[in-house]
Design a protein with these regions (language model features):
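Intracellular juxtamembrane helix-capping segments at the cytosolic ends
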Residues: 122-135
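A late C-terminal transmembrane helix in Major Facilitator Superfamily
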Residues: 134-169
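Paired small-residue
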Residues: 107-115
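Multi-pass alpha-helical transporter architecture, strongest
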Residues: 180-215
Length: 215
């Protein structure tokens, strides 16, 4: 879906809804991803009572499932709708974290590790591939770089918000709940990240030039 023959410039890409929907969806995913990277061992030791060694072992399984998801996601992205894959991954990120936070069992920890790791891996390849499909390759670097500025805001906000709320409430439940719901809501961004229509910058500047010439 949405493979473009035309190559967008950075300014043309930024004027499309697709650029913003992908960037916001990608950022919403990192609310959970960045928080888990920094806070999962702390959550497991402080809220769930695990030893530091066991918490580190559990956290270490996340990259394993991410690897499996990445391998699978690269294949599926060539066969199926990339937006659909990314959207499903968003639901997996959020629902897995909610399950772990609200159901205090070993099983839900395992469910989270599997769902989150697979979702991270499945979604990751689609982020660059969607941008390449939609905007072409000639300005891919600047487009990706500008997207990264937006994504980084989410990546920083996630762990800071979760940590702040944990200090205020005494546990990570509220913070992780908010981040989970934010990531699940990010599913909507990928629903609306439909292929863009290219409007050349020259076409936008043309009316202004025409008005000046007519004076």
């Amino acid at each position: 879906e949405g493979v473009q023959d035309a190559h967008f410039t950075t300014s043309e890409a930024v004027r499309t809804h697709s650029f913003w929907m992908i960037a916001l969806g990608h950022g919403a995913a990192l609310l959970v991803v960045s928080s888990v990277l920094t806070l999962l061992p702390l959550y497991l030791t402080e809220d769930r009572g695990f030893s530091a060694g066991r918490a580190a072992l559990i956290a270490g399984f996340v990259p394993l499932f991410q690897f499996i998801g990445t391998f699978t996601g690269g294949y599926l992205g060539d066969k199926f709708n990339k937006r659909l894959i990314a959207g499903v991954a968003m639901l997996m990120h959020g629902s897995g974290l909610l399950a772990m936070v609200y159901f205090d069992t070993w099983i839900t920890i395992g469910v989270f590790v599997v769902l989150h790791g697979l979702a991270w891996g499945l979604r990751g390849p689609q982020m660059a591939a969607l941008r390449a499909d939609y905007f072409g390759s000639s300005s891919f670097g600047p487009i990706m770089g500008l997207s990264s500025l937006i994504i980084t805001c989410f990546a920083v906000t996630g762990p800071v918000l979760a940590g702040y709320l944990a200090d205020r409430t005494g546990d990570f439940k509220l913070g992780f709940t908010i981040l989970s719901l934010g990531t699940i809501a990010g599913f909507i961004f990928f629903v609306f990240a439909t292929p863009p229509k290219r409007i050349p910058a020259s076409a936008i500047a043309a009316p202004a030039s025409a008005n000046i010439d007519g004076l």
